[in-house]
Amino acid sequence: MGYSSYLAGKWHLGGAHKSLWPLQRGFDRFYGCVAGSTRFFSPDTDQREGRGIYSGNQPVRKVTSTTDRAYYTTDAFTDHAIRFIKSGDEKKPFFLYLSYTAPHWPHQAHEEDVDKYRGKYLKGWDELRKVRHQRQMQLGLFEKGQTLSPRDEKVPAWSTLDLEKQKEMDLRMAVYAAMIDCIDQNVGKLLHVLKKREQFENTMILFLTDNGACAEGPALGRGEIHDIDKRNLETNNNYGAAWANLSSTPFRLYKHFTHEGGSATPFFIHWPSGIKPQKNWYRSQAQLIDVFPTLLEVCGVKYPESFEDRKLSPLRGISLSPSFVGKPLERSKPMFSEHENNAFMIDGKWKLVGKGV
């Protein structure tokens, strides 16, 4: 019977060649952008290649809001994903890849969401990094001895900024926080639909992000932030290394790098029917390449040695299923990764990193 397969959100793979787009690569339904990012409120006005919105293989010339507020991609991606689920064959299981562009730049958000966070960051990154680190340690997120990395040398002390600059930086972080708030709202909307359809208990949900905080551009951010209309037409405004340093607490460095600040990212699996509730922190390490073997095992599928007369390379990851019942993961080899000439090797409690190797 197989799975119905849906993609809502960004694709960011082989955008210049339509033969590599979602429908040509195994998905039944697609709504989103082929590129890695787009404007949140008006993606149909973004003329850069692949930055607009597509429904299947066809460009959407004029986007239409799916809610009672202005069109916003996070809302639209979720609502189209829900439509795919509701219109699918109820006799078939489904695979949904909901790939939000938020909180990737351009940093744009609904103003009512931004207003929730205005003023919350006026304590500045120096104080807030300490507060976050203390809370992380109190929660047991890290083991005893985890220190807070120094402030990025490119970032000035918060106390050296004048009041107007502090207010600007507070707004930049408030917009970023609002983008994540909107994700939270929409994930909640999707979960409500699954519960109403009695699919929640036996649906495995994997929530993860592809990299650490983004410090691209000037340390204090780039692009328009005060003028709302101009802000929402920007293509790359962001919050800079100053706030990315806070987002990466307690780690060093950011997206692009293989230090913990760039590669240690949030990732959780929720599956009430298959994962035993646990009371204690589980500390075995996992890597993205472990997801595929995990899904194959859960679905009872054996990875083939060949396909259409082609020999397939063996899987490099391991199944994460032992963690579902609190058992440790066992690897026969260290974990390796390379990205943009940055690399790491993890073996047990040790991590070796290379920058510009």
What kind of region is each of these model predictions?
Residues Y121-R151:
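Alpha-helical "lid/cap" subdomains adjacent to substrate-binding clefts that gate access
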Residues L7-K18, V34-S37, L96-Q108, L148-P156, ...:
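Short, solvent-exposed turn/loop segments enriched in Gly/Ser/Thr/Pro and often Arg
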Residues Y3, L13-R118, K123, E153-A177:
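Formylglycine-dependent
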Residues H17-G26, H107-A109, H192-W271:
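Histidine-centered active-site microenvironments of extracellular/periplasmic hydrolases
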Residues M1, A81, F94-Y100, Y176, ...:
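Beta-strand elements within well-structured catalytic alpha/beta cores of enzymes
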Residues M1-Y6, R25-D28, E90-L96, Q199-I205, ...:
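Loop/turn elements at helix/coil->beta-strand transitions in domains of secreted/extracellular proteins
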Residues Q58-T67, V114-G119, K167-M173, R231-T235, ...:
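Flexible glycine/proline-enriched surface loops and loop-helix/loop-strand junctions
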Residues L20-R29, C33-T38, L233-S263, G274-S284, ...:
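C-terminal cap/loop subdomain of S1 sulfatases and analogous C-terminal strand-loop tails that border
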